[in-house]
Amino acid sequence: MLIMKYLNNIKLSLVAAVFVCTGTVFTGCEDDLTISGSTDKLETVDGVYGYVRSAAGARELTPITLFGDKAGTGHLFFELTKAAEQDVTVTFKIDKDALEAYNEANNTSYEMYPVDKLSLANGGKITVKAGEKKSASMELNINAGGTIGTTYAVAVSATTDGGATVSTNNQTYIYLVKPQPTYPVRGTARDVKTLCFVEVNNENILNCGEYTMAKDGTPFFDVVSIFAANINVDSKTGRAHIFCNDQVSFLLKNADQIIRPLQAKGIKVNMTILGNHDESGMSSLSKEAAEDFAKELKAYADIYGLDGFDFDDEYSNYSENPSPGFEERSSANYCRLIYECRKIMPDKLLGIYEYLLYDAPNGSVEGKSAGELVDYMCYGTYQRYAKGREENFAGLPKSKYGPYSLKINNEYNGGWSGFNQETIQDLKDAGYGLQVFYNPEPRTFSYDHYFTAVSKVLYNDEVEWTGKYYNRTDFTSIQGTKLAYESYLGEWAATSSNSLYIYIDEDNNPRWWDWSGSQKFNVRIEEKEAGKSY
């Protein structure tokens, strides 16, 4: 039994039979449920105690969204305060009584999701193996059946059969469940799809939903990718796991306000996985590690309602003497990871960003080529057209490749630097299936004219901007100013970033030149052909 004198060391909220953690801090994507006070104090308690947690770092009351008639999945595991001295058998159960206790204690009125639509894998039984602190993940299957627009809850409690004690204040975990309508689908399928990577350290992905096609009002972007979560070595376990910084964590924590609005418009939302300066990476995972990492990715997709993942094999520090669970870098290992992802996530998008050829999956696994396993791949050197590059990857057709990625931030003058409309035409004519954009800065640039230059070629249509934009942490839009033809007329004060002076002789021949720094001058823009030119 739990001795009362240790309660102050545990520092958990005591609420009936429910582990209440609505005040927990969501600080990262790793399994990172923060209990008030240091969790290290749990190890000072006599005996071994356990508690129920969600995978993917999800705080309690994280909403799982069901789209139309599609099922959803929660991912739970059991964690001990100390390594188990023997195998600990854990039994999870769907617990309506625990939800009622939570409602009474917290003055809430959550309705239990229809129990006949819920089930636990393997009858709810799972094991914490001797010498370990955590069980594997247990899937909570949530079939469609609730009323759209209603917020439900599902409480899952746990008991153990020897080896550990589950105290009454940490035996239950609660997910919210939100049935939503089916995604809208674009009426006419596109031969060339658009993908936009958004640097969420600075920008809000909601901005991507403010650009629409003039003819039918559908979104300009097909896929938006959250850039980026990381693959890192877990210092406690030595395995590869997902790590998210505060900005990515904020976005996932607020998926209902940031991800769902884009999906409601028909835009798919992916999360990019990026290497992060240690030996873990897409190209170094062993077969078992790839299986394990794919399962973790699935937990993120299921819990946060992601449509898929993009993989960017930059910044990993691959080792020539890899640790257990890792191998020397190879495209074959990368292909194995994509195979494991495809096996357990057949309906999710899997995309690849590459710029070195060897930083991408290649070859085949179990008879499936890299080109068959991925949904698309793109060339990552910006403003350069890599026609024919797809031939380097096994089984990859042009329809799955994006050879012309455009960086559209300040570095490239909003995308105009290095942009060539004729290249877009050639991309389309050659049969390529993807046009990629990277790092939009919509609070700095008005992109409707730029995107129109692309869409006129690809879709014979123009792109309109709603005039609204979002700051990084905004859930509601700010009204901006839409520039029209007349907006540019008049006199403008301009400042150059630099200036070049060329000195000529009396015969008008250039003799020498010199940089002369920033200069200020006035420019007057006048109407030429009304509404069309200046």
Question: At which residue positions do the language-model features occur?
Answer:
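Bacterial N-terminal signal peptides that target proteins for export
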Residues: 3-15
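C-terminal motif of bacterial Sec signal peptides marking the signal peptidase cleavage site
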Residues: 24-28
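Secreted glycan hydrolases and related glycan-binding modules that recognize and/or cleave
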Residues: 30-89, 93-117, 121-123, 127-534
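Hydrophobic alpha-helical transmembrane signal-anchor segments
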Residues: 14-22
